[in-house]
Amino acid sequence: MTMRQCAIYGKGGIGKSTTTQNLVAALAEMGKKVMIVGCDPKADSTRLILHAKAQNTIMEMAAEVGSVEDLELEDVLQIGYGDVRCAESGGPEPGVGCAGRGVITAINFLEEEGAYEDDLDFVFYDVLGDVVCGGFAMPIRENKAQEIYIVCSGEMMAMYAANNISKGIVKYAKSGKVRLGGLICNSRQTDREDELIIALAEKLGTQMIHFVPRDNIVQRAEIRRMTVIEYDPACKQANEYRTLAQKIVNNTMKVVPTPCTMDELESLLMEFGIMEEEDTSIIGKTAAEENAA
């Protein structure tokens, strides 16, 4: 099997890291050889796989020893549940420098040190929020990741983010092989959520690859710094992540997306009752003016 490099994007706080780690645990359980590269200064992309608060990052360790060139691969790569290989890029202190630069440095280091040569089936990049700036777009800009999955929900801002990320994919698809593999709906239990994300996926020219229902067992596992797959392998939610993993293994629908205009996106949100039609007669009017009308 040729190594597949996948990047997981989505709005901040949508559950990307949790979804990615449970998905990866399911792939490992299936016998796949997987590496996770955390591309977020928070360094929380591997904690459930490693049972750790936060893995030491490549940028932190480079600062301690002097430079990235002074590090060894075994310093930065840890092995977790199911023999999953874990690395965190990290970034500078808040307010200092460009965290995206840390992603670029980290991925280049892993490549140069041969981290990608060990018979891997999948590499997953867990990428910071909905920021598609140059640094955080590194996994797609440099043709590292060729499959993108966007974690979203039926909430308005999560859908805006999915649309914006799709615009970024279109930009880089012109010069490379990057494609959108689908939307993963990490449910927030909003009304008609699955129908809404299926409709959004159709507008983007892609698919909702899986609907992950909300379940408190995810939080119970997280408190123990474990994936659901490891914490309670027989539970219903573990099977949801296994289904997602199998769908990604079998996925052949990889497209250049067709992002919506703002008007199209707002029409979709209005159609599903998430957004009300704008009343232009009240724009710019003070409370006193409205009361006098």
Curated annotation (Swiss-Prot):
Transmembrane segments: none annotated. [4Fe-4S] cluster binds at residues 98, 133. Its cofactor is [4Fe-4S] cluster. GO terms for molecular function: 4 iron, 4 sulfur cluster binding; ATP binding; metal ion binding; nitrogenase activity. The reversible ADP-ribosylation of Arg-101 inactivates the nitrogenase reductase and regulates nitrogenase activity. ATP binds at residues 10-17. Keywords: 4Fe-4S, ADP-ribosylation, ATP-binding, Iron, Iron-sulfur, Metal-binding, Nitrogen fixation, Nucleotide-binding, Oxidoreductase. The keyword Secreted does not apply. CDD domains: NifH. It catalyses: N2 + 8 reduced [2Fe-2S]-[ferredoxin] + 16 ATP + 16 H2O = H2 + 8 oxidized [2Fe-2S]-[ferredoxin] + 2 NH4(+) + 16 ADP + 16 phosphate + 6 H(+). One of its GO terms (biological process) is nitrogen fixation. The modification ADP-ribosylarginine is found at residue 101. InterPro entries: NifH/chlL_CS (IPR030655), NifH/frxC (IPR000392), Nitrogenase_Fe_NifH (IPR005977), P-loop_NTPase (IPR027417). HAMAP family: NifH. Belongs to the NifH/BchL/ChlL family. The key enzymatic reactions in nitrogen fixation are catalyzed by the nitrogenase complex, which has 2 components: the iron protein and the molybdenum-iron protein. This is Nitrogenase iron protein. It comes from Klebsiella pneumoniae.
